[in-house]
């Protein structure tokens, strides 16, 4: 957890949520001589997931309720280690689907509700969505990741000015 002090900010081409900043760029913080390729790899997965936690936090604040379950689809849903990492960082159960066509299924469900074949999305989901597995948060890991997330949230402010200075110099 936290890759022994190594943190990655995943702003490779700027960021939109929660920062509207096209000039921010990704960075590794805390690189040391003992870090290996596996640490950088895990740090990238953690950084991406911590960035998604920013979105989860905003959605929960706006909705004024906790998200009870998140659905993971696509290639990342096949990585059991990443699913567990997500459950621990989000402190929310992560479920995968029996079908790998999550986006297509969602579009078809929206169309079916739009055509009034179902009263609402919940009724449609009850008919079409089949879950494969559920990964539960691990309390000790959740607590450890809260500390990592606190450090992660400071990275944007700590690197923003340097990234903006860099962009102002290369644009000339």
For each predicted feature, which ranges?
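Glycine/Thr-rich phosphate-binding loops that ligate phosphate moieties of nucleotide
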Residues: 1-172
């Amino acid at each position: 957890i936290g890759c022994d002090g190594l943190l990655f900010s995943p702003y490779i081409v700027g960021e939109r949520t929660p920062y509207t900043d096209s000039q921010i760029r990704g960075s590794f913080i805390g690189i040391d001589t003992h870090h290996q390729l596996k640490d950088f790899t895990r740090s990238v997965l953690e950084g991406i997931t911590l960035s998604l936690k920013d979105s989860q936090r905003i959605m929960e604040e706006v909705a004024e309720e906790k998200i009870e379950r998140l659905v993971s689809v696509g290639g990342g849903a096949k990585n059991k280690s990443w699913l567990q990492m997500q459950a621990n960082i989000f402190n929310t159960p992560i479920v995968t689907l029996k079908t790998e066509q999550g986006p297509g299924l969602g579009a078809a469900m929206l169309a079916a509700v739009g055509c009034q074949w179902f009263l609402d999305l919940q009724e449609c989901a009850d008919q079409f969505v089949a879950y494969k597995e559920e990964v539960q948060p691990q309390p000790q890991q959740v607590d450890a990741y809260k500390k990592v997330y606190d450090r992660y949230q400071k990275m944007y402010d700590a690197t923003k000015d340097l990234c903006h200075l860099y962009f102002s110099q290369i644009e000339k």
